[in-house]
């Protein structure tokens, strides 16, 4: 006989998995929020708290994890064959590394925040954008340079011009953010209307 207490963790995991599945169309901001309405509420809350535009938040998540809550960097390989260590501790929607995530939790007094939750991830992105604005004086609306700082880190941002890959990534994020922004103009009014959510 299977004890109920033993299966509770599995029930929680599968429920969390179902709620965190990747949206069907991650190329369209309206489609994302129509499928995951609470995500719009979370992204809007981050914008109101930190000033990071919603389209920027989405573009960062799209680039970092493609909306996969369990995303991790692929493992490196020994002798090009044997799976080895991962190149960093990046995880979740925002691909935040452990050290920066712990700093975020301390500074925002959010001890229970997790990288696998969209709400916490977009709040983290908003916090990071806000700090980048304070530290590097980069406008919160400057998607290109904000992503360079996100990718390189505050300390290494000054060397971004030597990193061709970072520049390519930042340009793609800027393009994606512009696409999301234009799409949002078509559905934001409807999304801002009060909705009752039944769980």
Residue ranges and their predicted role:
Residues 3-10:
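Sec-dependent signal peptide recognition
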Residues 17-18:
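C-terminal motif of bacterial Sec signal peptides marking the signal peptidase cleavage site
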């Amino acid at each position: 006989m299977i004890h109920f207490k033993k299966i509770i963790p599995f029930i929680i995991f599968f429920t969390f998995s179902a709620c965190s599945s990747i949206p069907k169309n991650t190329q369209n901001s309206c489609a994302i929020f129509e499928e995951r309405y609470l995500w719009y509420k979370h992204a809007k809350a981050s914008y109101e708290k930190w000033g990071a535009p919603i389209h920027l938040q989405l573009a960062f998540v799209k680039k970092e994890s493609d909306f996969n809550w369990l995303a991790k960097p692929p493992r490196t390989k020994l002798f090009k064959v044997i799976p080895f260590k991962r190149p960093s501790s990046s995880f979740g929607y925002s691909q935040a590394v452990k050290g920066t995530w712990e700093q975020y939790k301390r500074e925002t007094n959010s001890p229970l925040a997790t990288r696998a939750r969209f709400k916490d991830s977009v709040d983290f992105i908003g916090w990071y954008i806000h700090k980048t604005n304070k530290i590097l004086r980069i406008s919160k609306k400057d998607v290109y340079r904000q992503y360079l700082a996100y990718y390189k880190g505050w300390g290494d941002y000054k060397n971004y011009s030597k990193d061709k890959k970072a520049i390519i990534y930042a340009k793609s994020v800027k393009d994606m953010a512009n696409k999301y922004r234009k799409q949002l103009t078509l559905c934001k009014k409807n999304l801002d209307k009060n909705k009752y959510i039944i769980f």
